[in-house]
Amino acid sequence: MANWRSLYPFASRFISIGGARMHYMDEAPVDASGATLLFVHGNPTWSFHWRRLIVALRSKYRCVAPDHLGCGLSDKPAHLLRLTDHIDNLSALIEHLDLRSITLVAQDWGGAIGLGAMLRLPERLSRMVLFNTGAFPPRYIPWRIRACRIPILGQLAVQGANLFSRAALRMTLARTSRLDPAVAAGYLAPYDSWANRRGVYGFVKDIPSGPRHPTWQTLAKIESGLPMLADRPSLLVWGLRDWCFLPDCLARFEEVWPQAEAHRLADAGHWVVEDAPDEVLPYIQRFLLTTDLTASRSARPVDTSSAAPGYNN
């Protein structure tokens, strides 16, 4: 496997949450009195996904990027972690580090996790940067995802053969058909065994198919809270050749945040940060320079916990 470590030049840090070690990076300039960028990844990625943005931005901004439990360099618990658990863990990290004036930067599942945490701690949030994500109950589940949820066969494919992570290396891109071997190795490195792929399969299982599912209820709570964040500056960058988070998802954010700055990249895919880095970085840099850190913090906290313990799916 190609050597990916030189692409990830960051010191590893850990916090203990419920007896498990959660990995994160915390890169900051000498004068770290300004904004904090909180990078929240999705599935099946990890903080490696943000490496180029952090290298480019850490000289001016504090950059914090955790790996969810079950992902990246964090511990891989044996039990299923639901969306509300990941929100709990991210909220604990935010409070442990006392992060304030946060600019949330999120993609895929990271949008629901990050916004779920920020709705619990709205006084800490200043701005939002979102890439191809959702924070509401899904109107559809793509067939590629449904196939991974077939009993027994889905788990064998995702957790056994690592097909979900391997397929992502190609199916999340549109401008190129193949990642550099070292980059591909970096994405796959933490997911090298059945046990280490529990979290990847757990995220697939936790996609809700109907209102009885506890994560559907969590997403509904997050969706109900999104209008409360409309006074925060927001940047939405979307790769339109994404078979998972379709343009409808972008439209749903624009509906609740009509002031949002939105960029549609017609020939970029789901991993828009990986597919179009030369466009994404300038959008972010300009947004950070031209928006206000002191946005209104009038929103009240929203309870984004699940109300359906014991659901077995």
Task: Label every PLM stretch briefly.
Residues 23, 41, 270:
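Histidine-centered active-site/metal-ligand motif
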